[in-house]
């Protein structure tokens, strides 16, 4: 099931000729429409001029499960059907299981996406669900280490009880810490062997551009980046006292992060443009 481009999006493409493409991947057995409507990206794409496509990637009684290869084929179909789309600026993000899948896609399909991210999941240690177990992704990251770079935006709530945030007791089996480590490995960065909460009480890692951001509703977010040669290849966001769900204010943060990167469709090389 593919929720096709709206009329406004098609008209926008005709005007602009080349626009970015963002895939949204819903959570485990969620309704794709719910994911799209609560993500914050539908409102954002109308302002920022990009195309959002929500996939029924997981399958249902009516549709076969896509898997990562199927998701890749959908991207090629869209690029062929809508030549206005920019093949150098294809991104994916998701919620929960969709976030785990987007995280895995950044490693498995590193030639396809310019950046990836997600809310409320990372890489699930000890789990073999959603095509993104730690063991296989770690092997691929090690093989690609230093040769492939993939920007990664990791966001979650500090009060998530479904996929808990990192703390001093769970870090060895924590989905977010596992994802940060594996992306550090693939990106050829210094690898954090274990968190040190004396350096940062939230993330346990010393981050650049570390700040606390407040929304107009009084909710705060902690954020910072890990860089390689001045390029922010990993951005982390923790929404204080928030649970297992999308957080609309962070959508703009993710999109601004994505827009710093494109990928050459021919050479597959990552291109860093800096902040706009």
Predicted regions located by residue number:
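The feature captures the conserved acid-bearing segment of alpha/beta-hydrolase catalytic domains
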Residues: 115, 121-220, 224-229
């Amino acid at each position: 099931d593919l929720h096709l481009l709206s009329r406004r999006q098609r008209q926008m493409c005709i005007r602009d000729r080349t626009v970015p493409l963002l895939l949204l991947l819903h959570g485990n057995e969620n309704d794709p429409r719910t994911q799209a409507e609560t993500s914050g990206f539908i409102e954002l794409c109308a302002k920022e001029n990009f195309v959002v496509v929500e996939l029924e990637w997981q399958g249902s009684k009516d549709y076969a499960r896509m898997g990562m290869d199927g998701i890749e084929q959908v991207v090629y179909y869209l690029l062929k059907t809508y030549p206005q789309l920019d093949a150098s600026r294809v991104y994916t993000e998701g919620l929960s299981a969709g976030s785990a899948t987007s995280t895995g896609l950044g490693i498995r399909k590193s030639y396809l996406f310019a950046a990836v991210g997600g809310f409320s999941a990372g890489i699930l240690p000890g789990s073999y669900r959603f095509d993104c177990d730690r063991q296989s992704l770690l092997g691929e990251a090690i093989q690609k280490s230093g040769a492939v770079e993939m920007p990664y935006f990791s966001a979650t709530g500090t009060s998530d009880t479904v996929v808990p945030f990192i703390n001093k007791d769970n870090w060895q089996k924590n989905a977010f810490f596992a994802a940060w480590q594996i992306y550090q490995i693939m990106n050829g960065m210094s690898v954090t062997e274990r968190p040190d909460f004396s350096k940062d009480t939230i993330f346990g890692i010393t981050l650049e551009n570390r700040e606390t951001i407040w929304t107009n509703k009084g909710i705060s977010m902690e954020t910072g980046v890990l860089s390689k040669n001045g390029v922010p290849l990993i951005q982390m966001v923790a929404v204080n006292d928030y649970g297992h769900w999308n957080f609309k204010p962070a959508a703009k943060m993710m999109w601004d992060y994505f827009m710093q990167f494109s990928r050459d469709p021919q050479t597959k090389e990552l291109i860093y443009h800096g902040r706009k």
